């Protein structure tokens, strides 16, 4: 697990929690929750890859792990679209920087999850 990615997640979550986007605060809270869920999922996949031979354990724990993987990729795509939309509508430079970093992080995490999942297959 890349320590820079972990600190990036923490930084972005902290920045997002400080934002006041008016009526869209529920949307932002939803994004924060999904970011946290995505981080936990990515971390658990990374740990499974680190423990060689853990594929069988992962499959035994959850026979639908491939389905979960597909759902996570859908969540990532949704988050990417939401972040892009927020980037288009916000005029505050602090928020723009935060959403740009969030977009970069999402793309990075998507690639990491793909790499982890290919190693598990």
Curated annotation (Swiss-Prot):
This is Nuclear export protein. GO terms for biological process: exit of virus from host cell nucleus through nuclear pore. It comes from the Viruses. Belongs to the influenza viruses NEP family. It holds the Pfam family Flu_NS2. Average number present in a viral particle is estimated to be 130-200 molecules. It is found in: Virion; Host nucleus. InterPro entries: Flu_NS2. One of its GO terms (cellular component) is virion component. Its main location: virion. Interacts with protein M1. May interact with host nucleoporin RAB/HRB and exportin XPO1/CRM1. The gene is NS. HAMAP family: INFV_NEP. SUPFAM superfamilies: Nonstructural protein ns2, Nep, M1-binding domain. Keywords: Host nucleus, Host-virus interaction, Transport, Virion. A motif (Nuclear export signal) lies at residues 12-21, 85-94. Mediates the nuclear export of encapsidated genomic RNAs (ribonucleoproteins, RNPs). Acts as an adapter between viral RNPs complexes and the nuclear export machinery of the cell. Possesses no intrinsic RNA-binding activity, but includes a C-terminal M1-binding domain. This domain is believed to allow recognition of RNPs bound to the protein M1.
């Amino acid at each position: 697990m890349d320590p820079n990615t972990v600190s990036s997640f923490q930084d972005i979550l902290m920045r997002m929690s400080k934002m006041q986007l008016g009526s869209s605060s529920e949307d932002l809270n939803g994004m924060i929750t999904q970011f946290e869920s995505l981080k936990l999922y990515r971390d658990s996949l990374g740990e499974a890859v680190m423990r060689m031979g853990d594929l069988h354990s992962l499959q035994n724990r959850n026979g639908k792990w491939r389905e979960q993987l597909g759902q996570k990729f859908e969540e990532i795509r949704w988050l990417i679209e939401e972040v892009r939309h927020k980037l288009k509508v916000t005029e505050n430079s602090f928020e723009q920087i935060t959403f740009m970093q969030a977009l970069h992080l999402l793309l990075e995490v998507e690639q990491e999850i793909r790499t982890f999942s290919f190693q598990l297959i």
